[in-house]
């Protein structure tokens, strides 16, 4: 399972941004090309792995959108996209997020108290965005049924678990000099 994801990661280009080695991948960056078969493989794995007894699928713009949309289409479960722009809709939840890459406000719409949600993300690095999102949704009376990210890099998943957030990931990677090393891949035997 996840052979295409594995192959695409080990063949992903790596660029330096300051002291940080950044891998370029279709799931995390949308370039060079996001193949439908890769989305299919990822979404099928998530359907087997995640608690799908939910009212909404939630993702933060931008790169969680392709995977979350695929899941929504396959299940008929509505999708709520956490946006970086304020809409001033009734019930809008505003939160401040800070990661190793950015700081800013995020806005949640289309989710109500009592809803059960699956949160889907492309990559967990620092875990900062997911930590703030989960806390804000829980404070609003929303039940987090599951949190799934396609790719895990760094300590963010462990930090989330230490904060009491059970997060599932499909692959764990690290960047070693100029290449991506896949350290762990989800198995349907787990």
From Swiss-Prot:
Domain of life: Archaea
One Gene Ontology term from the biological process aspect of the record: purine ribonucleoside salvage
Reaction(s) this enzyme catalyzes, per UniProt: IMP + diphosphate = hypoxanthine + 5-phospho-alpha-D-ribose 1-diphosphate; GMP + diphosphate = guanine + 5-phospho-alpha-D-ribose 1-diphosphate
Pfam name, any one: Pribosyltran
InterPro entries in UniProt: HGPRTase-like (IPR026597), PRibTrfase_dom (IPR000836), PRTase-like (IPR029057), Pur/Pyrimidine_PRTase (IPR050118)
Pathway membership: Purine metabolism; IMP biosynthesis via salvage pathway; IMP from hypoxanthine: step 1/1
Parts forming coiled coils: none
Keyword entries, A-Z: Cytoplasm, Glycosyltransferase, Purine salvage, Transferase
Membrane-crossing segments per the record: none
Record-linked CDD domains: PRTases_typeI
MF term (GO), any: hypoxanthine phosphoribosyltransferase activity
GO cellular component: cytoplasm
Subcellular location: Cytoplasm
Enzyme Commission identifier(s): 2.4.2.8
Gene3D superfamilies tied to this protein: 3.40.50.2020
Enzyme class: transferase
Physiological role: Catalyzes a salvage reaction resulting in the formation of IMP that is energically less costly than de novo synthesis.
Oligomer and partners: Homodimer.
Protein family per UniProt: Belongs to the purine/pyrimidine phosphoribosyltransferase family. Archaeal HPRT subfamily.
NCBIfam families, per the entry: HPT_Archaea, PRK02304.1-4
PANTHER family named in the record: HYPOXANTHINE/GUANINE PHOSPHORIBOSYLTRANSFERASE, XANTHINE PHOSPHORIBOSYLTRANSFERASE
Protein name in UniProt: Hypoxanthine/guanine phosphoribosyltransferase
Organism this protein belongs to: Methanosalsum zhilinae (strain DSM 4017 / NBRC 107636 / OCM 62 / WeN5) (Methanohalophilus zhilinae)
């Amino acid at each position: 399972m996840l052979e295409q994801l594995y192959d695409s990661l080990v063949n992903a280009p790596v660029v330096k941004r300051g002291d940080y080695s950044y891998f370029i991948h279709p799931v995390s960056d949308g370039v060079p090309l996001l193949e439908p078969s890769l989305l299919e493989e990822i979404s099928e794995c998530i359907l087997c792995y995640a608690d799908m007894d939910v009212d909404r699928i939630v993702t933060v713009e931008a790169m969680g959108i392709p995977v979350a949309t695929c899941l929504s289409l396959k299940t008929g479960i509505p999708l709520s996209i956490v946006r970086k722009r304020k809409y001033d809709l009734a019930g809008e939840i505003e939160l401040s997020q800070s990661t190793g890459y950015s700081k800013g406000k995020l806005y949640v719409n289309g989710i109500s108290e009592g809803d059960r949600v699956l949160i889907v993300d492309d990559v967990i690095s620092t875990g900062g965005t997911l930590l703030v999102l989960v806390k804000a949704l829980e404070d609003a009376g929303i039940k987090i049924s599951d949190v799934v990210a396609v790719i895990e890099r760094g300590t963010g998943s462990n930090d989330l678990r230490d904060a009491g957030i059970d997060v599932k990931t499909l692959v764990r990677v690290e960047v070693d000099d100029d290449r991506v090393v896949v350290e762990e891949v989800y198995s349907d035997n787990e």
